[in-house]
């Protein structure tokens, strides 16, 4: 990777269908097969209830810190290919899935990118409300700042409701 083009990124990976841990490990493997992507750190696994439908199977989640020379839209397309390769199908929002990958942060910048008839928002617009993202992210990036709100991750964690924190378990 060329030094000046390298961007630090954070991705959230989750699965609530099939062998969840294997799905996530395989997604990590596929990420690293791209010469324009390198994983630096990986959080532990966190088990959380499915949201908003708690009747769906539980999720396993991790966050990874990486480096990439891919542009934001190319990174988005790359991770969507991985999701499809792992069995993800076009379905309703918040449905169960073998693999879900979200871009949490791309070089501490915010993006709204048109993709077909939709927009991609980076960082993920609800990142600050999600315990299953904030806790693993805090584990590997204690000084991370949320670019949308210019807030430290510790400030975001303080605002998570206690009941939400009780629904997540370190594996």
Where is each model-derived feature located?
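Short, surface-exposed acidic-centric catalytic microdomains
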Residues: 26-72
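A structural signal for short, well-ordered beta-strand segments
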Residues: 13, 42, 62-64, 101-105
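Juxtacatalytic helix/coil linker segments
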Residues: 1-2
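Residues at alpha-helix caps and immediate loop-helix transition turns in enzyme cores, especially N-
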Residues: 23-24, 145
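Extreme N-terminal starter segment of soluble prokaryotic enzymes
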Residues: 5-10
């Amino acid at each position: 990777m060329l030094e000046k083009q390298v961007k630090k990124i954070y991705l959230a990976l989750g699965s609530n269908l099939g062998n969840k841990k294997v799905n996530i490990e395989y997604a990590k493997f596929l990420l690293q097969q791209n010469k324009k992507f390198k994983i630096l750190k990986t959080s532990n696994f966190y088990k959380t209830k499915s949201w908003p439908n708690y009747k769906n199977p539980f999720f396993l989640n991790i966050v990874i810190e990486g480096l990439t020379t891919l542009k934001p839209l190319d990174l988005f397309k790359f991770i969507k290919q991985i999701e499809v390769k792992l069995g993800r199908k076009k379905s309703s929002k918040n449905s169960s899935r073998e693999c879900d990958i979200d871009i949490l942060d791309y070089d501490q910048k915010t993006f709204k990118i048109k993709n077909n008839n939709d927009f991609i928002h980076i960082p993920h617009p609800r990142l600050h409300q999600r315990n299953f993202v904030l806790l693993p992210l805090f584990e590997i990036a204690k000084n991370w700042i949320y670019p949308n709100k210019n807030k430290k991750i510790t400030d975001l964690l303080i605002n998570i409701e206690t009941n939400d924190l009780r629904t997540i378990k370190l594996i």
